Amino acid sequence: MSFSTIVKDELCRIELHDECCMKSEILGVILIGNLFSNEKILRNTKVVTENAAFARRIYSIFRRIYGICPEVSIRRSSKLKKHVSYSLTLVPNQMINKILYDFGISAFTEDEYIPAASTLEKVCCRKSFLRAAFLSGGSISDPEKTYHLEISTHNIMSAEMIKDLLDDYNINTKIIKRKGSYVAYIKEGEQIVDFLNIIGAHGALMELENVRILKDMRNNVNRIVNCETANLEKTVNASIRQIENIKYIESTIGIDKLPENLVEIADVRVQFRDASLKELGEMLHPKLGKSGVNHRLRKLDEIAERIRKNNQR
């Protein structure tokens, strides 16, 4: 089961008790689902969905609010995966004008959908509209792979309406045109969490948050491992360089020609190739800190470099 299906199934279990919220969900279905269509004289309304729970929800709300029992037909795809789709049709003359009047919609053409400003005045109604918008045309990617939530609409006005509503919640929504549709989408994980909270998908929200936490932990572990690997590589390379310089000094002027403190550090460096600066300092008499050890080893590097330059003349 896809994550989109999980979210939609959860949303369909949310019970509505207020008529205003039920009407707001119907508005979401109308605008986002492109519910109305013109067929010459007859005016038909139809919504098609592959989600059985959403089909039942639409049927129930229309029956409770308008006393309409949509005609339901089921279609099974002949393709390999055999998808099942549910079509709900409101036949002509079944209070269609009443539905339009409630939403301030005066025409069937997509560019003239004008919902009444008061329809989404309440916070609960705005949430109901956004919930229905996602149920009608929304999808969300598997959070294990990427963060992406979108709602596909059939007209720019509907997409902009969604964007305006989400702007009020400080959710950054962008709109793109894709194959004749207008898609409002969200890309940031934290803002997708906020959207799921608004529409009431709290179970899916927690699942997404868990995934985000695990991904953050994995990323942090990877950063730490990469940092430690880089530091280890740096330490190994430094050790190799230091030992080469010590051997070069020994083969040219001899280590015993150096001050006693440099002879001592050269001796432990050669004996303990994998030791850190701190560990080398612990082996000296008296003990020396990391900065002191590093200073002496740099002195050996400088001496070796001077000898090389003199030999090249």
Swiss-Prot record:
Residues 276-309 bind DNA. GO terms for biological process: cell division; regulation of sporulation. Belongs to the WhiA family. It holds the Pfam family HTH_WhiA. GO terms for molecular function: DNA binding. The gene is whiA. This is Probable cell division protein WhiA. Keywords: Cell cycle, Cell division, DNA-binding. Involved in cell division and chromosome segregation. It comes from Ruminiclostridium cellulolyticum (strain ATCC 35319 / DSM 5812 / JCM 6584 / H10).
